[in-house]
Amino acid sequence: MSKSNTYRMLVLLEDDTKINKEDEKFLKGKPGKMHEFVDELILPFNVDELDELNTWFDKFDAEICIPNEGHIKYEISSDGLIVLMLDKEIEEVVEKVKKFVEENN
C-alpha cells in the first residue's frame, strides 16, 4: 500500500483468455479470464471515512454499476484498495468511471 491512506481504485478490463497450444504447456491450469490494467484513480476520502465511502459508492452504483449490471464488479479492501473490473465489451465505460471520479472528488 502507498504511504497515503486515501482509497485508490485500480481499473481493469476483463476478457476471456485465448490460449494457443504452445502456451498451454507452460500453464498449470487454464485461466478463465485475462485482466488488463487500465488506470489507477485516487478517490476523495481516506480509509477511516466509511460514511463517505458508503455515500460515494451509493452514487457510483446508481450511475455506473446498475446500468452495466452483469458486466462490472468491484472489491473493496480495508487497506484502501478498490479493484474495479469491467468486461472488455464495455470498455467505453472506463471513461465514464474516470469522469465520475473527477466530478465527485
UniProtKB/Swiss-Prot annotation:
Recorded GO cellular component terms are: cytoplasm; nucleus
Where are residues bearing N-acetylserine located in the sequence?
A: S2
Identify one Pfam family in the record.
DUF1892
**Gene3D superfamilies named in the record:** YML108W-like (3.10.20.250)
Q: Does Chloroplast appear among the keywords?
A: no
Q: Which UniProt keywords apply?
A: Acetylation
InterPro entries from the UniProt entry: DUF1892, YML108W-like_sf
Q: What else is known?
A: Present with 2610 molecules/cell in log phase SD medium.
Q: What is this protein called?
A: Uncharacterized protein YML108W
State the organism of origin: Saccharomyces cerevisiae (strain ATCC 204508 / S288c)
Top-down, what is the taxonomic lineage of the species of origin?
Answer: Eukaryota, Fungi, Dikarya, Ascomycota, Saccharomycotina
